[in-house]
Amino acid sequence: MTINLLGALATAFIICAVTGPSFISVLHKLNFGQSIRECGPKEHMKKSGTPTMGGIMMLLAILVAVAVWCNFTPALCIALLLTFGHALIGFIDDYIKVVMKRNLGLTAAQKFFLQFVLAGAYVYYIETHVQSDLSIAIPGTEYMLPLGWLYYVLVFLLLVGTTNAVNLTDGLDGLAASVTLPVTVAYAFIAYNTGHADLSVFALAITGACLGFLLFNHHPAKVFMGDTGSLAIGGGVAALALLTHTELLLVILGGIYVMEATSVIMQVTYFRLTGGRRIFRMTPIHHHFELGGWKETKIVKRFFAASCLLCIAGVLLWLNGNGGF
């Protein structure tokens, strides 16, 4: 099985590395360039026109890697559905913004509806394929907290929250992909040690795709993943949390995602309550550090290191609640 895990990692990486230059060239010819908001950091204006929708090559790499190195089990199929389903939402959003030149893309209501449909697909899966008591594990303990029908609400909140948090994290060159690396490695470990070798292969396929994509997305980025990529990654990570029954642990493993999303919520809430005052210079919080004088590369390195530490802590906590090795 070790060969399958390493094979998936290597295959996804190689596909991204090999197809990247040609794919970026095609995006250039199609004029699929990213438009930069004027309200963002001024340094980002020079990135205008950089090809976006690079998430498509990541998805191709993930699909091929999984198809070559793993059988399509029900759990793997639902993970792919949540990943590619959210990728489709992101692609539609990117297409509207980049091709149709409508900067707002899909409305929030349209996104929520499509995500609700995907959440419904997962609910159908657990009702038909899993004998679940609709409970969640408390990290670091063996206690399972029964939620009943509230578990279905959690599914929707986790999917919407994770996908949008990853989307918010994708605001600097290489940031979302870098932060995701330790998260998917951690989930590969957890999945493998809970008897979900298929999900472990899937997690490492995402890892390989992110590594390959970083060859072209590191600063200065030659391509952006777009909503196509960020929503797909969010869907994949959320699927891993749901299918390994580590919903609450994701708050720790994906702590950077949580921090990014929370900073936006805090900023908007405080702004409205105080009539225009702000807590941070700009959100998501990576822009706060950027406007404070930190270079993009410094922020990405610090956030990556923090993500690694959070994932180590999360895995140790998970081991404590599961009797160790």
Report each predicted region and the residues it spans:
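Short aromatic-rich membrane-water interface segments that cap or initiate transmembrane helices
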Residues: 48, 138-150
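Alpha-helical transmembrane segments
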Residues: 1-28, 58-88, 122-128, 148-325
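Peri-membrane helix termini and adjoining interfacial loops of integral membrane proteins
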Residues: 31-36, 90-93, 129-136, 279-283
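Hydrophobic alpha-helical hairpins/lids featuring a short glycine-rich hinge
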Residues: 72-107, 111-112
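Membrane-interface helix termini and inter-helical loops of multi-pass transporters
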Residues: 99, 130-143, 322-325
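A cross-family signal for N-terminal binding/gating loops and helix N-caps
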Residues: 28-33, 41, 45, 57
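Juxtamembrane helix-capping/reentrant segments at transmembrane boundaries
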Residues: 36-50, 101-114, 286, 291
